[in-house]
Amino acid sequence: GRLREIAFRSAGGGTGKACDIDSFDLMDPPCRQLIVWDPENRIILGGYRFIIGEDVKICDDGRPRIATSHMFGFSERFKREFLPATLELGRSFVRVGYQSSKAEAKTIYALDNLWDGLGALTVVFPQIKYLFGKVTMYPGFPREARNMILYFLTKYFPDPDELVRPFTPLETGMDTAALDALFTGGSFKEDYKILNRCVRDLGCNIPPLVNAYMGLSPSMRMFGTAINDEFGDVEESGIFFAISEIFEEKKRRHIGTFNPRELGFMA
C-alpha cells in the first residue's frame, strides 16, 4: 500500500493518505495482490491488485462490490454473462525510480513482468475468460494529447452494446471534427502512427499501460472515461477484452511461458 501511494502520488494521483489500503483490500473476500519481485535487490518493482468474478458480491443497490463501481454503471447483461468469468484489475503501479523516462528500460522490464504475471493468472484461474481494468491519465497530462488518445481508443475499441458506462462521463471539450480530419490513415496501424507522432510533438508519450493494452487484442472494448474523485481526480478509462482474443504472439509470450507445476500451483 505504501509503494502504491508513493508511485501514484509522484504522478499526480493517489489517495493523499500515508498508505493506499482501502476497503477493497480488506473486505471478505479481499482483492489479492500480484507483485513483480526483484530477487537480486530484494525489492518490489510493481504490482496489480485483482479479484476474480466468482468472489465479487453484488450490493443491495445492484452494484458489484468492486473498486470501479463508484464511477461506472454495469448493465444487467454484463453482470449476468461476463462478470462471473472476469478478472478485475486495478491499482497497477511501477515503483518510483523505475517509471521515469530516464529509466525506460527498467520500466519496460517491470511492465513486461507484470504482463507475465497476468498471463500466469489466466492459467492458475482457468475459469477466467475476460479481463476488465482501467487505464489512467493524470491531471497534468496535456489535454490535447489526452483527447487524441481518447478519440483513438473510442474509434478502434468501441463498446456498441454499452455493457459498461461511466455515471458521469469526462467532459473533454474534444474537437471531434478536427480529430476526424487528423486520423485519416484508414487503419489501426496507420492511425496509430499519426497518434504516436502527434502526441510526441506535444512533448509527451502515450502512457505505457495504454500502449500495452492497445497491443493486446483487436476486439478490446473501451467503456468511456470518468474522473476518480477518490484518487486524486485522475481520469480513468474502463477497458475489457476476452482472453481468447488476445493476439497469439502475446499469448505465447505472456501465457505460454508459464509452467504452473514448476511453482507448485498444480499437482
What are the language-model segments listed below?
Residues 1-52:
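Short amphipathic alpha-helix that is part of the acyltransferase structural core
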Residues 6, 40-42, 53-56, 95, ...:
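Short loop/turn segments at secondary-structure transitions that flank enzyme active sites
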Residues 7-15, 160, 220-223, 246:
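Short secondary-structure junctions and interdomain/linker hinges
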Residues 24-35, 58-59, 220-221, 231-237, ...:
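A short helix-loop-beta-strand connector motif used in the catalytic cores of GNAT acetyltransferases and
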Residues 31, 45-47, 84-89, 128, ...:
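Extracellular structured ligand-interaction cores
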Residues 36-38, 50-52, 91, 133, ...:
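Hydrophobic side chains in beta-strands
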Residues 55-220, 224-228:
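Acyl-donor binding region in acyl/amide transferases
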Residues 237-267:
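C-terminal non-catalytic accessory extensions
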